[in-house]
Amino acid sequence: MTLKELLVGFGTQVRSIWMIGLHAFAKRETRMYPEEPVYLPPRYRGRIVLTRDPDGEERCVACNLCAVACPVGCISLQKTETKDGRWYPEFFRINFSRCIFCGLCEEACPTTAIQLTPDFEMGEYKRQDLVYEKEDLLISGPGKYPEYNFYRMAGMAIDGKDKGEAENEAKPIDVKSLLP
């Protein structure tokens, strides 16, 4: 072993001890989770929920756009119709063990029924418990869009009533009368 190799080896040892000394007294990055809250960015995408419109009815019209937009195919639903002609899902199922929380289902939803919340505590012991049904996903409130009601905004006719005759619905605008 030459003197040069000996000095290089000694230098690396001193540098390693110096680095350990610097990091030994630095602030720790590990946070104790339950005691210290976790910082979530404003646009954090967590658990998926189904919201209700201001009247208290579920917003989902079972259009199946969320299931088509999902890249992993974790959403499944079946459409049914009420007596007054409104569509709603007979069942709505999300498999959270497959979900990648990309938010494409929220973007595809025309009624803002699907929304991603900042809830991230979804650990389960059995994989079957990560399959959420409609009853598990429905929340009691309107979510991020409190005043939005799809049937009022879309102008869809309900059986037995023309457009504009439903409850709390404005009359449709005659576009031809607005022309110069």
UniProtKB/Swiss-Prot annotation:
Would I find Metal-binding among this entry's keywords? yes
Localisation: Cell inner membrane
**InterPro entries hit by this protein:** 4Fe4S_Fe-S-bd, 4Fe4S_Fe_S_CS, NADH_quinone_OxRdtase_chainI
Q: List the disulfide bonds.
A: none
Any coiled-coil ranges, and where?
none
Q: Does the keyword Cytoplasm apply?
A: no
Topological relation to the membrane, as annotated: Peripheral membrane protein
Show where the 4Fe-4S ferredoxin-type domain sits.
50-80, 90-119
EC number(s) from the headed UniProt entry = 7.1.1.-
Residues bound to [4Fe-4S] cluster 1 = C60, C63, C66, C109
Quaternary organization: NDH-1 is composed of 13 different subunits. Subunits NuoA, H, J, K, L, M, N constitute the membrane sector of the complex.
Give the family per the record. Answer: Belongs to the complex I 23 kDa subunit family.
Q: What does this protein do?
A: NDH-1 shuttles electrons from NADH, via FMN and iron-sulfur (Fe-S) centers, to quinones in the respiratory chain. The immediate electron acceptor for the enzyme in this species is believed to be ubiquinone. Couples the redox reaction to proton translocation (for every two electrons transferred, four hydrogen ions are translocated across the cytoplasmic membrane), and thus conserves the redox energy in a proton gradient.
What this protein is called in its record is: NADH-quinone oxidoreductase subunit I
Q: What is the lineage of its organism?
A: Bacteria, Pseudomonadati, Pseudomonadota, Gammaproteobacteria, Enterobacterales
Q: Which gene encodes it?
A: nuoI
